[in-house]
Amino acid sequence: MSDNAQLTGLCDRFRGFYPVVIDVETAGFNAKTDALLEIAAITLKMDEQGWLMPDTTLHFHVEPFVGANLQPEALAFNGIDPNDPDRGAVSEYEALHEIFKVVRKGIKASGCNRAIMVAHNANFDHSFMMAAAERASLKRNPFHPFATFDTAALAGLALGQTVLSKACQTAGMDFDSTQAHSALYDTERTAVLFCEIVNRWKRLGGWPLPAAEEV
């Protein structure tokens, strides 16, 4: 058996990166000025046979930072009332501190070197998380500063679809449109979609890579 055929660990699969699925709901499109209102994160794990699956889930409603813009159109779209006391919202610091703590623990346990965000249209989620981490003065950010795995691009390649709901349905997954634009639900669906794309590539023989002499 080649060395490549034995690469079944999470640390081997993504060049030492620890994939963490993220989705955010916000009060606009500008990460510097508009409020982060909700964030969910799902870590991933790999079994002994090299199949990828969801692991730990974290979810927080977030208080708008002082001076944040709250765009009415964005709030109408996601249905979030930032002033609803039943949201149980926490500060950006509290939400990201807890997520980063769990992610750092996962990096260490898996033998990985750094976290990488998995998200649908990842630039949006990445920009808001990074801006919030900067505002919260969180120095030990475990995520890569710019690299991501974007499931919109991956699904376009693997499934011919770039919209999350259509990609999930094409992959044979359920998608409840009434729950869409909840950070928790969208993160759960994105995590399962990413795992399906990675595992489908493995089922098709694309991973582990063949040894050099076999190519």
Curated annotation (Swiss-Prot):
UniProt cross-references to Gene3D superfamilies, sorted A to Z: Ribonuclease H-like superfamily/Ribonuclease H
Positions annotated as active site in the UniProt record: 181 (proton donor/acceptor)
Name of the molecule in the record: Ribonuclease T
Any GO CC annotation of this UniProt entry: cytosol
Binding residue positions for Mg(2+) 2: 23, 25, 181, 186
Domain of life: Bacteria
Family classification: Belongs to the RNase T family.
Pfam families in alphabetical order: RNase_T
GO biological process: DNA replication proofreading; tRNA processing
Site (Important for substrate binding and specificity): 29, 77, 124, 146
Cofactor(s) recorded in Swiss-Prot or TrEMBL: Mg(2+)
Residues the entry annotates as binding Mg(2+) 1: 23
Domain Exonuclease per the UniProt entry, residue ranges: 20-194
